[in-house]
């Protein structure tokens, strides 16, 4: 259900964008967000080993995957990781991909995609300071801050150690 909502949201949002340089920057940000969601979905499917059609989880609008490439790559974790590492996001996600190969957890990768998206939003905000991108960057940073505060509160309530709580935070 969550993926269907994401798919409808991004497809509608991307189809309604106008022209102009600031809009192109916003579109680039949205495409990166779609790429990160598709990468996360593909990695989840590849790691689960479940016999689920990856194309059903594909969100249109990104540049990293096509429906066919996502379906093919989600069946082979090594090829998927290599595809992401060789992409325009390889530099930002490289450390997380290495950790993903070594550890057996997607959490670090998901945190790295969140941090990379925040950093990308910050970069766009400095390129076009009189556009929507600084506002998006600010909203994303505040959203991440609230999520981190919630993680700290839940961790303390559950009696987790400081190290365990810190591993759940996304810090840029």
Where are these regions (language model features)?
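Extended alpha-helical surfaces
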Residues: 1-172
């Amino acid at each position: 259900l969550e993926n269907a909502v994401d798919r409808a949201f991004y497809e509608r949002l991307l189809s309604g964008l106008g022209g102009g340089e600031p809009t192109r920057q916003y579109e680039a940000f949205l495409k990166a967000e779609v790429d990160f969601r598709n990468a996360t979905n593909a990695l989840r499917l590849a790691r689960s080993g479940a016999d689920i059609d990856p194309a059903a989880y594909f969100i249109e609008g990104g540049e990293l995957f096509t429906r066919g490439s996502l379906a093919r790559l989600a069946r082979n974790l090594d090829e998927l990781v290599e595809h992401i590492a060789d992409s325009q996001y390889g530099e930002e996600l490289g450390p997380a991909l290495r950790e993903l190969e070594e550890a057996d957890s997607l959490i670090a990768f998901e945190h790295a995609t969140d941090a990379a998206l925040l950093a990308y939003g910050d970069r766009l905000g400095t390129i076009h300071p009189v556009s929507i991108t600084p506002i998006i960057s600010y909203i994303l940073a505040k959203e991440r801050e609230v999520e981190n505060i919630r993680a700290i509160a839940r961790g303390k309530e559950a009696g987790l150690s400081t190290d365990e709580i810190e591993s759940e935070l996304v810090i840029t």
